[in-house]
Design a protein with these regions (language model features):
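Residue-level signal for inorganic ion chemistry
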Residues: 18, 73, 170
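A short, flexible beta-alpha/helix-coil linker loop
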Residues: 1, 53-57, 151-153, 185-186
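Glycine-rich FAD cofactor-binding loop and adjacent beta-loop-alpha segment at the N-terminus
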Residues: 1-35
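Conserved N-terminal helical subregion
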Residues: 30-129, 136-142
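Conserved FAD-binding catalytic core of PHBH/FMO-like flavoproteins
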Residues: 116-186
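Short glycine-enriched, charge-decorated loop/helix-capping segments at active-site entrances
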Residues: 2-9, 55-58, 132-133
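Short clusters of hydrophobic/aromatic residues that line enzyme substrate/ligand-binding pockets
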Residues: 8-10, 27, 48-50, 126, ...
Length: 186
């Protein structure tokens, strides 16, 4: 899989799930906590500020680069004896069984499994095979994504500003950096 330097925010609930499954120690060194969120709306007087301390939480969420998250997940899966990861691989057939499926890969290898997850992209062979519905909505926006260094260290503060053209967000990252996501009309 290809993982790039874009950052994602993990909710507090997602982090709790990683703790429950024993994966958090692998993720923690790569994460930056979101301890405060400031939300504003251009052209309106209202604004909101959320603080993890107000909710008795160590953080409202965590920010991690996709590359670090991907590598961490791969290492975690490699450490699980009951997970057999095939990557890259291309499915050619799926045969339903009473309890699971038999998968045939393009190279002819066959695998039987009780669980098959349709997480193979926007043109999912698995989704198409099982005729799973797709819901799409074009927001007619593009996102400008960058990692920026600001004059002041973000220190756990995230910012989101809603504008007529789309939202603008800054997420705190490690080493005093921030992830910028700026949605602009297409």
């Amino acid at each position: 899989p290809g993982f790039d330097a874009r950052a994602i925010a993990l909710s507090a609930g997602t982090c709790e799930a990683l703790v429950r499954h024993g994966l958090w120690p692998r993720f923690a060194p790569h994460c930056s906590p979101i301890t405060q969120i400031h939300v504003s709306d251009r052209g309106h007087f209202g604004q909101a500020s959320l603080s993890a301390a107000e909710y008795g939480l160590p953080a409202l969420g965590q920010v991690i680069e996709l590359s670090a998250a991907g590598i961490t997940l791969q290492q975690g899966m490699a450490a699980c004896p009951n997970i057999h990861m095939l990557c890259p691989a291309q499915l050619s057939t799926i045969e339903p069984l009473e309890e699971g499926v038999t998968l045939t890969l393009a190279g002819g290898e066959r695998y039987q499994t009780r669980l098959l997850v349709a997480a193979d992209g926007g043109h999912s062979f698995v989704r198409q095979h099982f005729k799973l519905p797709v819901s799409r909505h074009d927001y007619e926006q593009s996102a400008i994504i960058a990692t920026v260094k600001t004059a002041e260290d973000p220190a756990g503060r995230a910012f989101e500003r809603f504008t007529d053209g789309g939202p603008l967000a800054l997420l705190p990252m490690q080493d005093g950096l921030s992830s910028l996501v700026w949605s602009v009309p297409r």
